[in-house]
Amino acid sequence: MAGHSKFKNIMHRKGRADAARSKLFSKLSREITVAAKSGVPDPNMNPRLRLAVNNAKAESLPKDVIDRAIKKSQMGDAADYSEIRYEGVAAGGVGIIVEVLTDNKNRAAANVRSYFTKMGGNMGATNSVAFNYDRVGQVSYPAKAASEDDMMEAAIEAGADDVVSDMDEEGEGHIVYTAFESLNEVAAALEAKFGPASNTKIAWRPKMQVPVTGDAVATLMKLLDALNDDDDVQAVYSNEEISDEDVAKLG
């Protein structure tokens, strides 16, 4: 799994380097607006909004931008966004789930489909990939936040289901998994002990990994990059496992 984690981290750094910071801020702002519109515009009374605001703060989204995104949800001319899940199979048999937040369903569907097609993949029907994933709550902390033992102990006390710690320099740090119904309670308990998380969300966790080697690795990465770079795409989940050797070839 080490190669898999490092591969994800390389993608993460590459995405940050290649994508404009404003694009990330736009996605965070959109989630805040939709979350506020789905309930009351008060993070203390709206769990989804609270998560969106906390994640935005973790990414250093300015407070005035957060406030504007919340106010925008209460305006009569605020765009109506649709939340859509697309699923497909990529090079090497990797199953991908794409979560979209869009004000134009036709545009989003056409774009996502084109990415899969151009990169040798195929779009699938709803649940054609999701059955290989679990819907979970996920709380992430950097490795420096705690030792493996301390994070495990705190997670167990908080009622979490599992902890994966990757303490390598290029690793993903601590990822705490919990039932999605318990996410807010677990996140609050961990925050009381370790401070704010780097990310807290409802996520898709793969039940099994699909080994990917050779040329399929680069093709897969191009697809994942294209999906993550799309303005309508909020999150992408995939179940590839890649060796350290193949990761090194990516440069």
UniProtKB/Swiss-Prot annotation:
It is found in: Cytoplasm. One of its GO terms (molecular function) is DNA binding. Keywords: Cytoplasm, DNA-binding, Transcription, Transcription regulation. It comes from the Bacteria. The keyword Transcription regulation applies. InterPro entries: Integrase-like_N, TACO1_YebC-like_2nd/3rd_dom, TACO1_YebC_N, Transcrip_reg_TACO1-like, Transcrip_reg_TACO1-like_dom3, YebC-like. GO terms for biological process: regulation of DNA-templated transcription. One of its GO terms (cellular component) is cytosol. Its main location: cytoplasm. The keyword Transcription regulation applies. Belongs to the TACO1 family. This is Probable transcriptional regulatory protein Caul_0780. It comes from Caulobacter sp. (strain K31).
